Protein backbone atom coordinates (compact mmCIF):
# COMPACT_ATOMS: atom_id res chain seq x y z
CA UNK A 1 0.00 0.00 0.00
CA UNK A 2 2.92 2.32 0.61
CA UNK A 3 4.54 2.63 -2.78
CA UNK A 4 2.13 4.61 -4.92
CA UNK A 5 4.64 7.41 -5.54
CA UNK A 6 3.11 9.82 -3.03
CA UNK A 7 5.46 11.16 -0.36
CA UNK A 8 2.38 11.68 1.84
CA UNK A 9 1.29 8.05 1.77
CA UNK A 10 0.56 7.17 5.42
CA UNK A 11 1.90 3.63 4.92
CA UNK A 12 5.45 4.67 4.04
CA UNK A 13 8.00 3.48 6.60
CA UNK A 14 8.81 6.98 7.84
CA UNK A 15 5.15 7.46 8.85
CA UNK A 16 5.01 4.33 10.99
CA UNK A 17 4.72 5.01 14.71
CA UNK A 18 6.01 2.94 17.64
CA UNK A 19 2.50 1.78 18.57
CA UNK A 20 1.83 0.49 15.04
CA UNK A 21 2.02 -3.02 13.65
CA UNK A 22 3.77 -3.34 10.30
CA UNK A 23 3.52 -6.30 7.97
CA UNK A 24 4.69 -7.19 4.48
CA UNK A 25 1.46 -9.01 3.69
CA UNK A 26 -1.55 -10.91 4.93
CA UNK A 27 -3.37 -14.07 3.91
CA UNK A 28 -5.55 -11.95 1.59
CA UNK A 29 -2.89 -10.41 -0.63
CA UNK A 30 -0.17 -11.70 -2.90
CA UNK A 31 3.26 -12.58 -1.56
CA UNK A 32 5.65 -9.62 -1.60
CA UNK A 33 7.56 -11.17 -4.48
CA UNK A 34 4.33 -11.87 -6.36
CA UNK A 35 3.18 -8.29 -5.74
CA UNK A 36 6.46 -6.86 -7.01
CA UNK A 37 6.46 -9.09 -10.09
CA UNK A 38 2.93 -7.90 -10.92
CA UNK A 39 3.98 -4.23 -10.97
CA UNK A 40 4.68 -2.38 -14.17
CA UNK A 41 8.26 -1.35 -14.85
CA UNK A 42 7.28 2.20 -13.87
CA UNK A 43 5.79 1.05 -10.57
CA UNK A 44 8.88 -1.04 -9.83
CA UNK A 45 10.96 2.07 -10.47
CA UNK A 46 8.90 4.00 -7.89
CA UNK A 47 9.81 1.35 -5.30
CA UNK A 48 13.49 1.45 -6.28
CA UNK A 49 13.54 5.27 -6.26
CA UNK A 50 12.14 5.23 -2.73
CA UNK A 51 14.82 2.79 -1.58
CA UNK A 52 17.56 4.91 -3.17
CA UNK A 53 16.19 8.19 -1.78
CA UNK A 54 16.16 6.71 1.73
CA UNK A 55 19.65 5.20 1.51
CA UNK A 56 18.52 1.57 1.39
CA UNK A 57 19.96 1.18 -2.11
CA UNK A 58 22.61 2.83 -4.27
CA UNK A 59 22.18 4.14 -7.81
CA UNK A 60 22.55 1.18 -10.15
CA UNK A 61 21.20 -1.32 -7.61
CA UNK A 62 18.11 -3.39 -8.27
CA UNK A 63 15.26 -4.27 -5.93
CA UNK A 64 15.58 -7.55 -4.11
CA UNK A 65 12.08 -8.67 -3.27
CA UNK A 66 10.90 -9.64 -0.77
CA UNK A 67 14.14 -8.97 1.10
CA UNK A 68 13.89 -5.20 0.73
CA UNK A 69 10.34 -5.06 2.11
CA UNK A 70 11.24 -7.36 4.99
CA UNK A 71 14.17 -5.12 5.94
CA UNK A 72 11.95 -2.02 5.80
CA UNK A 73 9.41 -3.71 8.08
CA UNK A 74 12.00 -4.95 10.56
CA UNK A 75 13.83 -1.61 10.61
CA UNK A 76 10.63 0.35 11.19
CA UNK A 77 9.74 1.87 14.54
CA UNK A 78 6.61 -0.31 14.73
CA UNK A 79 6.20 -2.27 17.94
CA UNK A 80 5.50 -5.43 15.97
CA UNK A 81 6.72 -6.51 12.53
CA UNK A 82 4.96 -9.44 10.88
CA UNK A 83 6.51 -11.27 7.94
CA UNK A 84 4.39 -14.02 6.35
CA UNK A 85 6.12 -17.36 5.88
CA UNK A 86 5.84 -17.05 2.10
CA UNK A 87 7.94 -13.86 2.28
CA UNK A 88 10.48 -15.41 4.65
CA UNK A 89 10.86 -18.23 2.12
CA UNK A 90 11.06 -15.77 -0.83
CA UNK A 91 8.10 -17.40 -2.59
CA UNK A 92 6.28 -15.92 -5.56
CA UNK A 93 2.58 -15.48 -6.22
CA UNK A 94 2.06 -19.18 -6.91
CA UNK A 95 2.19 -19.58 -3.13
CA UNK A 96 -0.48 -17.01 -2.35
CA UNK A 97 -2.81 -18.12 0.44
CA UNK A 98 -6.16 -16.58 -0.52
CA UNK A 99 -7.79 -14.46 -3.22
CA UNK A 100 -10.79 -12.67 -1.65
CA UNK A 101 -14.04 -13.04 -3.55
CA UNK A 102 -13.08 -16.38 -5.09
CA UNK A 103 -14.16 -19.84 -4.01
CA UNK A 104 -11.60 -22.09 -5.66
CA UNK A 105 -7.90 -22.58 -5.07
CA UNK A 106 -7.75 -20.81 -1.72
CA UNK A 107 -6.00 -22.07 1.39
CA UNK A 108 -4.02 -24.67 -0.56
CA UNK A 109 -0.51 -23.53 0.34
CA UNK A 110 1.17 -25.49 3.10
CA UNK A 111 4.50 -24.82 4.74
CA UNK A 112 7.07 -27.59 4.41
CA UNK A 113 10.34 -27.70 6.33
CA UNK A 114 12.14 -28.65 3.12
CA UNK A 115 11.49 -25.08 1.93
CA UNK A 116 13.67 -23.64 4.68
CA UNK A 117 17.00 -22.39 3.40
CA UNK A 118 19.84 -22.12 5.93
CA UNK A 119 21.04 -18.85 4.42
CA UNK A 120 17.56 -17.34 4.82
CA UNK A 121 17.65 -18.31 8.50
CA UNK A 122 21.06 -16.70 8.99
CA UNK A 123 19.91 -13.55 7.16
CA UNK A 124 16.78 -13.33 9.31
CA UNK A 125 18.72 -13.77 12.53
CA UNK A 126 21.18 -11.06 11.48
CA UNK A 127 18.36 -8.65 10.67
CA UNK A 128 16.47 -9.43 13.87
CA UNK A 129 19.63 -8.64 15.83
CA UNK A 130 20.48 -5.58 13.74
CA UNK A 131 17.04 -4.03 14.21
CA UNK A 132 16.61 -4.95 17.88
CA UNK A 133 13.81 -7.45 17.36
CA UNK A 134 15.24 -10.36 19.33
CA UNK A 135 13.78 -10.34 22.83
Which residues fall in each region the model found?
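Catalytic cores of glycan-processing enzymes that make or break glycosidic bonds
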Residues: 1-135
